[in-house]
Amino acid sequence: MEMEAKRSRLLTTARPYLQVLSLFGLTPPAEFFTRTLRKRRRFCWMAGYSLYLIAILLMVFYEFHANIVSLHLEIYKFHVEDFSKVMGRTQKFLIVAIATCNQLNILLNYGRLGLIYDEIANLDLGIDKSSKNFCGKSHWWSFRLRLTLSIGLWMVIIIGVIPRLTLGRAGPFFHWVNQVLTQIILIMLQLKGPEYCLFVLLVYELILRTRHVLEQLKDDLEDFDCGARIQELCVTLKQNQLLIGRIWRLVDEIGAYFRWSMTLLFLYNGLTILHVVNWAIIRSIDPNDCCQLNRLGSITFLSFNLLLTCFFSECCVKTYNSISYILHQIGCLPTAEEFQMLKMGLKEYILQMQHLKLLFTCGGLFDINIKLFGGMLVTLCGYVIIIVQFKIQDFALIGYRQNTSDTS
């Protein structure tokens, strides 16, 4: 496994974000995947990081117990012995499930992650090699700038916003130390979204560069009086086809790596939104409650974290699908009709694009796209309506009991 800077410009650019994610126990440090690290030092680093992950997991279990105790005290205080208890306990349990899943994923899929890094580095070099005969320059944004604006900025927002949104939400039964540790855990959970988006953007950059080579090839076929270079251009077309096939397989590996962690993140964020709405309704009768705006911010934040994941995946798929349009444009050129070798190569490439549909999935459990996010919003709105109906009935019953006790 290699992640040397000389091998891959993409992985070198992504390294700082991977380091931050490793601090929160989400992914192994990038140094573990370098051949320059001596075996003894690698073993010491891995042993130390394993102990660090165990400490994080123990902290999560401890805070799970503290949060459950605080939840029961809040439920007893507001007399809401209904589904609020079940929903709250399930939401707290999902935190433990996600943290445990992350640690097991690092342990069981360590080799798969190394292969993913290797394939990204090899694809990076392969695309550079296939484009060396073209003099045109790409006009897309700098990859470093794209990561800074999309991943870096969002990670800073997550780390900065979560403590403000959760401040004082746990009530008077929660010690400030537990609150700080809980905030760290919540940051860790939500950073799983940017981690996934980082890999999506790596794939996106590979597709952009592969498409750019194809566009340059099209320009050469338009301007060049084909003859001597037609065989060279056909070889470039075949290389481009093979690279796209490898990118498709890479996306499949990434989906398998993030299968359970992303599934649990979607489930946790959806359930937490319902949990926040439920407590917003319960606390609405408390004149001293000052956290309603924070609850609205939490709902928006949790939704937006999932939206970004779906949005980047959708953009990547659309860019991949645009390659078929470029192939059809090349097929319409007079050169494609003139040279049988080029015509057959285009036909094979187009058939491959028709069969290898790019989909970002959680290991085949569901597709990550804007359609998923829209369906999730509709489902949540339906559950919110049900919660509101139940709470209206509860408030009416409480009011009736109070009136009865006052008259008696």
From Swiss-Prot:
Transmembrane parts of this sequence: 43-63, 93-113, 147-167, 184-204, 262-282, 297-317, 368-388
Function, as annotated: Probable gustatory receptor which mediates acceptance or avoidance behavior, depending on its substrates.
Entry keyword Electron transport: no
Main subcellular location: membrane
BP terms from Gene Ontology: monoatomic ion transmembrane transport; sensory perception of taste; signal transduction
Protein name: Putative gustatory receptor 98c
Family listed: Belongs to the insect chemoreceptor superfamily. Gustatory receptor (GR) family. Gr2a subfamily.
One GO cellular component term noted in the UniProt record for this chain: membrane
GO molecular function, one term: ligand-gated monoatomic ion channel activity
Compartments (UniProt record): Cell membrane
Membrane topology: Multi-pass membrane protein
Keyword terms, alphabetized: Cell membrane, Glycoprotein, Membrane, Receptor, Transducer, Transmembrane, Transmembrane helix
Organism from which the protein derives: Drosophila melanogaster (Fruit fly)
Cytoplasmic-facing ranges: 1-42, 114-146, 205-261, 318-367
Pfam family, one: 7tm_7
Annotated glycosylation sites: 403
Segments in the Extracellular topological domain: 64-92, 168-183, 283-296, 389-408
Keyword Transmembrane helix: yes
